[in-house]
């Protein structure tokens, strides 16, 4: 599992990574007016606190999940660091939040998303501190909520299809929300919010639809690896104790 996973992620990085540093990941530092920065921050904070509580409850009853939680966070960090310049002040990239939402639920991903976005803003100059709330809301809140809902709705019919659609639609949701955030901050000259939204979304779609499909396929691959090696991840743990939103261990 270790070698196959490393090889796949390495190939994915080589294919999608671009050295262009002129664009910031997500919404760039200073790009949103202060009022909108505060607005999105206020919307994101309750979800982050909800996620902290959820992580505390999960790890208190199942401390062995720390490694899996770290893996979900690393998956988000690696995939969301692969950027393709798109709309001015932002860019297109995979998000990686679908896997964690499937395994742990949407609340946990708000915390992991916040940590990843903060590290990337501080260490990689991707995104920003002032726009952290907006980026957390799009990638750490709305994307995982859709991914989790899609997976729960379809998992009993076909698990692989459910994982693929959950990851892909979670990715697209992130960019729909980002387009809405940009449209609200920078409406069309006519003042029509929908016109501005569809302008941003149409530009994102050129790169984001192929990325969403690719992320869905990669997430299915990683999900299957985790499922196949669950005995190694949980040595000696009775099957009846493998419960919770992390479905692959059931």
From Swiss-Prot:
Q: Which UniProt keywords apply?
A: Cell membrane, Cobalamin biosynthesis, Cobalt, Cobalt transport, Ion transport, Membrane, Signal, Transmembrane, Transmembrane helix, Transport
Quick check: keyword S-adenosyl-L-methionine in the entry? no
Where would one find the signal peptide in this protein? 1-24
Entry's transmembrane regions = 32-52, 67-87, 99-119, 122-142, 161-181, 203-223
Where is this protein found? Cell membrane
Recorded metabolic or biological pathway in which this protein acts: Cofactor biosynthesis; adenosylcobalamin biosynthesis
Bilayer topology term: Multi-pass membrane protein
A single Gene Ontology CC annotation of this entry is: ATP-binding cassette (ABC) transporter complex
A single Gene Ontology MF term assigned here is: cobalt ion transmembrane transporter activity
Question: What processes in GO biological process is this protein linked to?
Answer: cobalamin biosynthetic process
- Assembly and oligomerization: Forms an energy-coupling factor (ECF) transporter complex composed of an ATP-binding protein (A component, CbiO), a transmembrane protein (T component, CbiQ) and 2 possible substrate-capture proteins (S components, CbiM and CbiN) of unknown stoichimetry.
Protein family membership = Belongs to the CbiM family.
Q: What function does the entry list?
A: Part of the energy-coupling factor (ECF) transporter complex CbiMNOQ involved in cobalt import.
Q: Please give the HAMAP family that the UniProt record associates with this protein.
A: CbiM (MF_01462)
What is the name attached to this protein's record?
A: Cobalt transport protein CbiM
Which species?
A: Desulforamulus reducens (strain ATCC BAA-1160 / DSM 100696 / MI-1) (Desulfotomaculum reducens)
């Amino acid at each position: 599992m270790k070698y196959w996973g490393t090889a796949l992620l390495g190939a994915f990085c080589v294919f999608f990574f671009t050295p262009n540093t002129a664009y910031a990941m997500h919404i760039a530092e200073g790009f949103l007016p202060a009022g909108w920065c505060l607005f999105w921050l206020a919307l994101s904070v309750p979800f982050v606190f909800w996620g902290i509580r959820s992580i505390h409850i999960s790890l208190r009853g199942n401390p062995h999940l720390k490694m899996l939680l770290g893996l979900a966070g690393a998956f988000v960090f690696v995939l969301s660091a692969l950027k393709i310049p798109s709309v001015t002040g932002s860019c297109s990239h995979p998000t990686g939040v679908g896997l964690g939402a499937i395994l742990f639920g949407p609340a946990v991903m708000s915390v992991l998303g916040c940590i990843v976005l903060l590290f990337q803003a501080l260490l990689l100059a991707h995104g920003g501190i002032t726009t952290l709330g907006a980026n957390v809301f799009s990638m750490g809140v709305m994307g995982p909520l859709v991914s989790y809902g899609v997976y729960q709705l379809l998992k009993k019919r076909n698990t692989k299809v459910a994982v693929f659609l959950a990851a892909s639609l979670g990715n697209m949701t992130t960019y729909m929300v980002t387009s809405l955030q940009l449209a609200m901050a920078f409406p069309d000259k006519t003042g029509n919010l929908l016109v501005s939204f569809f302008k941003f979304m149409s530009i994102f779609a050129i790169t984001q639809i192929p990325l969403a499909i690719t992320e869905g396929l990669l997430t299915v691959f990683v999900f299957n690896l985790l499922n196949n090696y669950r005995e190694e991840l949980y040595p000696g743990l009775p099957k009846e104790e493998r419960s919770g939103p992390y479905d692959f261990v059931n």
